[in-house]
Amino acid sequence: METKNYSSSTSGFILLGLSSNPKLQKPLFAIFLIMYLLTAVGNVLIILAIYSDPRLHTPMYFFLSNLSFMDICFTTVIVPKMLVNFLSETKIISYVGCLIQMYFFMAFGNTDSYLLASMAIDRLVAICNPLHYDVVMKPWHCLLMLLGSCSISHLHSLFRVLLMSRLSFCASHIIKHFFCDTQPVLKLSCSDTSSSQMVVMTETLAVIVTPFLCTIFSYLQIIVTVLRIPSAAGKWKAFSTCGSHLTVVVLFYGSVIYVYFRPLSMYSVMKGRVATVMYTVVTPMLNPFIYSLRNKDMKRGLKKLRHRIYS
């Protein structure tokens, strides 16, 4: 069989999408368009509410506004191309376009992960060490955490894309997914991917597990501290400040772990698609609702923003 390297000798890949059934393309287009618009509008409202209300200019809401921005970027990398493909017969993505999509998908997704860890640290300091909160979570420290999150994520993405660009591909160029993700693309390669899989798994463990463990450790510390609070009202107040964030963490990491922390031989296309939709589309769409429905400060900020818009 002749081996061809797609980086130089082909026009690109074909994205199979969520379903090959022609009758489902328009309904899926409508569903994902609505979800994308809800994601964009909801997260923009969160950002505007935070920046328009001085009382929300705190470390927690600084990270939340950046998380909302990253969620918009994250879904924009994937959903617009998916929407075009729903109404297109070719569903082609160029080789370079595939690598670019893969790069920004990983960069924004990993930044999301680090921002969730930063928010967990913020809650840890606020609940477990409130007297030192202003010192530990000063604006300069928060900015450094944000810059560190972005830098590590983009370096990780660059390394991964450079690794993928060295692979060769054979006759098949159909990606059984709705975007260019690592596992489906690796499955197409006719190169020896064992070393690539090992590097990807090791590097993924280092980059993704680090913020995840940081988040878990923070919440274990928070739980221990809250359980020592004598009054039930005090416990409820402490837990209520973390409930929204913890819900988002479970949704995000639950699906990420299911998709990425398995050998390539165990990868299931259909299950992988469903789990990927959860953290790439559903979670970013739900985040504004999760963070605002039970948050009095956010409700006040959104109400204030609404009065400004209509006044």
From Swiss-Prot:
Cytoplasmic side, ranges: 51-58, 122-140, 221-237, 294-311
Recorded topology in the membrane: Multi-pass membrane protein
Major localization class: membrane
GO cellular-component term (any): plasma membrane
Transmembrane segment boundaries: 27-50, 59-80, 102-121, 141-159, 198-220, 238-260, 274-293
InterPro entries from the UniProt entry: GPCR_Rhodpsn (IPR000276), GPCR_Rhodpsn_7TM (IPR017452), Olfact_rcpt (IPR000725)
UniProt keyword annotations, A-Z: Cell membrane, Disulfide bond, G-protein coupled receptor, Glycoprotein, Membrane, Olfaction, Receptor, Sensory transduction, Transducer, Transmembrane, Transmembrane helix
Glycosylation site positions: 5
Subcellular location: Cell membrane
Disulphide connectivity of cysteines: 98-190
Stored CDD domains: 7tmA_OR1A-like
Gene Ontology terms: biological process: signal transduction
SUPFAM superfamilies tied to this protein: Family A G protein-coupled receptor-like
UniProt xrefs under Pfam families: 7tm_4 (PF13853)
GO molecular function: G protein-coupled receptor activity; olfactory receptor activity
Classification via PANTHER family: OLFACTORY RECEPTOR (PTHR48001)
Family: Belongs to the G-protein coupled receptor 1 family.
Functional note: Odorant receptor.
Protein name: Olfactory receptor 1L4
Natural source organism: Homo sapiens (Human)
